[in-house]
């Protein structure tokens, strides 16, 4: 029988519930329990696929094609696992399912209500996933008191009643500010947040107190007294340099040990040696390389969270810290490529729409002509093709039909199966697809095998009618779709130091102990450029 750990948040959003949940899941897995994480997003969207990155950060793509909240990326990285679309529960999904059942007549004429029909649907989905696991960590998005979260908190309360207190625990993540005027940590916001939670019938078993500095003992005792939580279950979670330190901090504070005991699970020492070594290696790095990310959402770096993490993983693997230079693509259009001077590598990531397109291609040309290590991803792959068509093949006005439907040279075109679709949500080429890599190429050297599976999120592709012209001019398409060899997946320029682009998103499968090969190669090339071979 599975044990459930619900993680809730209070006071303010953006405290790091996702990292706390990922860390707790990782610590339970490190103890030998078969563990998974679920994210509940209380918005009415069915999934994250059509959301603006400036509002919610990147859209993370799963193997099964699910477009989900970026927290699931943290879960996958921390637990070194692959999740499914079912691991992301949204209000949109729940209400859609309940309305569909009502239309089908499943409720036999009953008045359909939030309680019990919505809450039952929520519990059913959580239990369905739990069947294969010992421990399930469920993060409830939003902040206690939000009207959107109410049905999910009620479902969690009911689950403790139905499963038994020994099988359900609650961890509440809250904020302890330190006012400069008085110079002490204030616990009142936490007290009120827990009071709100208790008014909903939920008594937290542990409190993770987020603060800038370690929690003062007086604050710990005060929180314990006013929230009815033992002092040892009031966990200090202060700011650290890197998120990968958080599991080690929470382990030192005893969170997983306390929850293990609270749920009646056997006490075990966690296997954390490899993780600890990875964190220590990262903290000890002194040499630095600078990689420019030229994008259209750079004002919110979480729009490219998985790319940031993949660079971090690759930095540790190559013995260098990676400093990111965030470059707004439109600024390149206004001020020129001088914004890229001095960088050791350039990434042009995915994105949609015309804004910043010319700036991205200016960055691609700058990398190509100055032999700067380069990686293009998804739309960056397509724009690399457009830039090459214009400036090497001399095809004036070449473009993607996404940006210019009337282009005389549609070197990037809508995939045939995408034509005629009238819905945006969930209709792209999504999820893991096979990619066949040609021998004697950089891609084969990086991946070390012929067949790989990588995650995709696109509607446009390289127009097969132009492939021969590109190849004659020296552009190598080193990877093709395993299910359709006319669909290009990887390109490279062999005469360059490191110049590669992928139609897929390699960042989504990068892990702290196993960096994505094309990122690892990019950082290696950047290091060699700066420090010599």
Curated annotation (Swiss-Prot):
Catalytic activity: UTP + L-glutamine + ATP + H2O = CTP + L-glutamate + ADP + phosphate + 2 H(+); L-glutamine + H2O = L-glutamate + NH4(+); UTP + NH4(+) + ATP = CTP + ADP + phosphate + 2 H(+)
Domain called Glutamine amidotransferase type-1: residue spans: 290-532
Regulation: Allosterically activated by GTP, when glutamine is the substrate; GTP has no effect on the reaction when ammonia is the substrate. The allosteric effector GTP functions by stabilizing the protein conformation that binds the tetrahedral intermediate(s) formed during glutamine hydrolysis. Inhibited by the product CTP, via allosteric rather than competitive inhibition.
UniProt binding sites for L-glutamine: 54, 351, 379-382, 402, 459
GO molecular-function terms, A-Z: ATP binding; CTP synthase activity; glutaminase activity; identical protein binding; metal ion binding
UniProt superkingdom: Archaea
Region (Amidoligase domain): 1-265
List of residues binding CTP: 13, 146-148, 186-191, 222
InterPro entries associated with the record: Class_I_gatase-like (IPR029062), CTP_synthase (IPR004468), CTP_synthase_N (IPR017456), GATASE (IPR017926), GATase1_CTP_Synthase (IPR033828), P-loop_NTPase (IPR027417)
Entry's Gene Ontology BP terms: 'de novo' CTP biosynthetic process; pyrimidine nucleobase biosynthetic process
Residues that coordinate or bind Mg(2+): 71, 139
Active site: 378, 505, 507
Residues that coordinate or bind UTP: 13, 186-191, 222
Signal peptide: none
Pathway(s): Pyrimidine metabolism; CTP biosynthesis via de novo pathway; CTP from UDP: step 2/2
E.C. number(s) listed in UniProt: 6.3.4.2
Database matches in NCBIfam families: PRK05380.1, PyrG
Record HAMAP family: PyrG
Assembly, per entry: Homotetramer.
Family according to the record: Belongs to the CTP synthase family.
Role noted for this protein: Catalyzes the ATP-dependent amination of UTP to CTP with either L-glutamine or ammonia as the source of nitrogen. Regulates intracellular CTP levels through interactions with the four ribonucleotide triphosphates.
Remaining remarks: CTPSs have evolved a hybrid strategy for distinguishing between UTP and CTP. The overlapping regions of the product feedback inhibitory and substrate sites recognize a common feature in both compounds, the triphosphate moiety. To differentiate isosteric substrate and product pyrimidine rings, an additional pocket far from the expected kinase/ligase catalytic site, specifically recognizes the cytosine and ribose portions of the product inhibitor.
Matches recorded under PANTHER family: CTP SYNTHASE (PTHR11550), CTP SYNTHASE-RELATED (PTHR11550:SF0)
Protein name, as recorded: CTP synthase
């Amino acid at each position: 029988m599975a044990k459930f750990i619900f993680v809730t948040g209070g006071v303010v959003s953006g405290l790091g519930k996702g990292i706390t949940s990922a860390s707790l899941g990782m610590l339970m897995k490190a103890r030998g329990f078969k563990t998974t994480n679920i994210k509940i997003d209380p918005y009415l969207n069915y999934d994250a696929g059509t959301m603006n990155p400036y509002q919610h950060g990147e859209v993370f793509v799963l193997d099964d094609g699910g477009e989900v909240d970026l927290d699931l990326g943290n879960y996958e990285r921390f637990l070194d696992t692959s999740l499914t679309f079912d691991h992301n529960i949204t209000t949109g999904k729940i209400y859609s399912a309940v309305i569909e059942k009502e239309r089908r007549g499943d409720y036999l004429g009953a008045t359909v209500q939030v309680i019990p029909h919505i809450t039952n649907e929520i519990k059913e989905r959580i239990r369905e996933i739990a069947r294969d696991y010992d421990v399930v960590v469920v993060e409830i998005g939003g902040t206690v008191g939000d009207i959107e979260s109410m049905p999910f908190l009620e479902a969690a309360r009911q689950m403790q009643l139905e499963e038994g207190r020994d099988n359900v625990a609650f961890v509440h993540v809250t904020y302890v500010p330190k006012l400069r005027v008085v110079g002490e940590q204030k616990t009142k916001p936490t007290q009120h947040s827990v009071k709100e939670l208790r008014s909903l019938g939920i008594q937290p078993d542990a409190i993770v107190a987020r603060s800038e500095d370690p929690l003062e003992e007086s604050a710990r005792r005060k929180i314990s007294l006013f929230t009815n939580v033992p002092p040892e279950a009031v966990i200090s979670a202060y700011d650290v340099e890197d998120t990968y330190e958080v599991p080690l901090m929470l382990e030192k504070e005893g969170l997983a040990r306390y929850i293990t005991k609270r749920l009646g699970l056997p006490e075990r020492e966690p296997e954390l040696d490899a993780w600890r070594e990875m964190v220590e290696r990262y903290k000890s790095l002194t040499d630095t390389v600078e990689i420019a990310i030229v994008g259209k959402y750079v004002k919110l770096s979480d729009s490219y969270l998985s790319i940031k993490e993949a660079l971090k993983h690759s930095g540790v693997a190559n013995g260098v810290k990676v400093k990111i230079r965030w470059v707004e693509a439109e600024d390149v259009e206004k001020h020129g490529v001088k914004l890229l001077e001095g960088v050791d590598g350039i990434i042009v990531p995915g994105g949609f729409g015309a804004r910043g397109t010319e700036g991205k291609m200016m960055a691609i040309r700058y990398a190509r002509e100055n032999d700067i290590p380069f990686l293009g991803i998804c739309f960056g792959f397509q724009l690399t093709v457009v830039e090459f068509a214009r400036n090497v093949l001399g095809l004036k006005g070449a473009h993607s039909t996404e940006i210019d439907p009337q282009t005389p040279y549609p070197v990037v075109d809508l995939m045939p199966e995408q034509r005629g679709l009238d819905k945006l949500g969930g209709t792209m080429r999504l999820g893991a697809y096979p990619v066949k890599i040609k021998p004697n190429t950089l891609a084969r050297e990086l991946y070390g095998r012929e067949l790989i599976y990588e995650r995709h999120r696109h509607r446009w592709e390289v127009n097969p009618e132009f492939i021969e012209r590109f190849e004659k001019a020296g552009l190598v398409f080193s990877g093709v779709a395993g299910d359709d060899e006319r669909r290009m997946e990887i390109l490279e320029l062999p005469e360059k130091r490191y110049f590669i682009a992928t139609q897929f998103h390699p960042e989504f499968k990068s892990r702290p102990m196993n960096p994505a090969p094309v990122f690892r190669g990019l950082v290696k090339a950047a290091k060699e450029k700066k420090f010599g071979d």
